[in-house]
Amino acid sequence: MVSSVPKLHALFVSKSQPVLRAAKVTNEERSTKSKLARSLARAVNSNPWSDELESSLSSLHPSQTISRTTVLQTLRLIKVPADGLRFFDWVSNKGFSHKEQSFFLMLEFLGRARNLNVARNFLFSIERRSNGCVKLQDRYFNSLIRSYGNAGLFQESVKLFQTMKQMGISPSVLTFNSLLSILLKRGRTGMAHDLFDEMRRTYGVTPDSYTFNTLINGFCKNSMVDEAFRIFKDMELYHCNPDVVTYNTIIDGLCRAGKVKIAHNVLSGMLKKATDVHPNVVSYTTLVRGYCMKQEIDEAVLVFHDMLSRGLKPNAVTYNTLIKGLSEAHRYDEIKDILIGGNDAFTTFAPDACTFNILIKAHCDAGHLDAAMKVFQEMLNMKLHPDSASYSVLIRTLCMRNEFDRAETLFNELFEKEVLLGKDECKPLAAAYNPMFEYLCANGKTKQAEKVFRQLMKRGVQDPPSYKTLITGHCREGKFKPAYELLVLMLRREFVPDLETYELLIDGLLKIGEALLAHDTLQRMLRSSYLPVATTFHSVLAELAKRKFANESFCLVTLMLEKRIRQNIDLSTQVVRLLFSSAQKEKAFLIVRLLYDNGYLVKMEELLGYLCENRKLLDAHTLVLFCLEKSQMVDIDTCNTVIEGLCKHKRHSEAFSLYNELVELGNHQQLSCHVVLRNALEAAGKWEELQFVSKRMATLRESDDCSVLE
């Protein structure tokens, strides 16, 4: 409805109108443009694109053309890329001439939203959309190359780069920097080498500081620190001076490679150079961490004091890094000195949660649980909030010492305070809570364990073993529905339960009469590439039939036949009967035919008896004919009942067809329905059929007379 869209006034004027003279934009004009952009975006965001929406958009701002600023602001405010593109085309159709900036903005919008195919098509339509006024240039390709890289599609980035060159568009240093970063993040160091050579030798593009920082960081992250160091040394050849980021990157790479002495020399070289580049807190902290990783704590302490002597103020990361190294070396007295020294007028370091976590872990690792608990209590005394790491270390240690009561107290506190849902940077580890999950699930407290587990899931933490522990716990406690819900969650996260978990859950669901859930679990089991034993199929089918779930029973029988699962004649008969009783005779006959085609039988007498009792005589007629087709014996009394019933309901043709079939097979002699059939045919005026029956009756009388004479 037009009325549902915010009323807008005439947005565009004729192209024939004179162009307004450029004037200084006032704050009031800016406010008007922003307000108009918000109104346009609000209309687009809150309504599906339609002729009504376009009509309403066209009714804004009479006698004034829309400004370039308004178009750009509107594009930035539109939420859905497809709507943004429609708006882009719509203003163009109304006479607005897009320039380079709006094309670039639209391309960035599509790329950020991962609409990459649309973005690619848009890129190659720029010249057409602008009537040749806007030419393809490297910045457009750079945008889409970055978008492909952010989506993890590095090969598409490379292909687009090749296309760019084939079209005669020279890559810029920004193009090469983007592609180098993408390749190195994917570990394609060889391709990055080749690209760097192509950059210099083929295109003559001079690397800048960002290029070298990208290469050095990429090679360091790919454990190629020697190559990174060589690139670092080559910077002077290109008159490109390393900045502090460059130095810090190479120092970090060397430290991670265990070459801490060389990293120290690099830092010392920074100090000796008469440049504006000096080591900062990151430089020293990285070196401290490097020495701590090699357990050269004395050297780490010396670097720390050297940092202080040069007037650099350590930050929390510096202190925590050194404290971690000292605690792992069990040099606790020196930690006190560091903390005391960190409270002078210069440094003013206040221990944070990370500091206490380091100390707690160190004490736990050393087997000093009481000391760890004291540190934890001191943390609370200082009004600091323990995070997931604080609790997980203590809970795991208590479980290892079989002190489950104390562990459970902390576990409950963890849940009640919603520690796992906190915004701390420390991502919880599910494995740390597994011992507690196992204990609770083994002691009838699975619900308590699941509460914490669901908090972990909300933080994006996944752990397949925990799912099994909880599902098993619920099953052990007879709570099969919660177990089923966890299994569904597990599969949604693309984790596959094991065979034992599936079988345990199906068995439990059947025990409480949850046939549909058991059937669903069985189907999920099959989709997980497991094939249950025949008894599992039979158990589920029996419960479905018992609960009168006709459609599900039908589906399961057909599935069993498809999977070549052995059939049970009693169950098959029960399912066919259920389908007949549910007015689904087509499915009933289909099942019967499929069973017989696969070499299985049903209890025909039972089915025919049911159909006759319930006056489903046409179905009984069809079923008897099927039996005769398959050469299966049918009780003659049943045939009499079917024929007489059909006659009674004036289904003379069906009654005669069955009689005729019995005659052809020589099975009519024992029939007692001749008179009933003859009378019905006579009343219906079916003389030809009447004559046929009469002849058979005469033949039978003659045969009987001969038998008497003999």
From Swiss-Prot:
One of its GO terms (cellular component) is chloroplast. Keywords: Chloroplast, Plastid, Repeat, Transit peptide. It is found in: Plastid, Chloroplast. The keyword Repeat applies. It holds the Pfam family PPR_2. InterPro entries: Pentatricopeptide_rpt, TPR-like_helical_dom_sf. The keyword Plastid applies. SUPFAM superfamilies: TPR-like (SSF48452). PPR repeats lie at residues 137-171, 172-202, 208-242, 243-277, 280-314, 315-351, 352-386, 387-421, 429-459, 463-497, 498-532, 533-567. Its main location: plastid. Belongs to the PPR family. P subfamily. PANTHER family: ATPASE EXPRESSION PROTEIN 3, EXPRESSED PROTEIN. This is Pentatricopeptide repeat-containing protein At1g02060, chloroplastic. It comes from Arabidopsis thaliana (Mouse-ear cress).
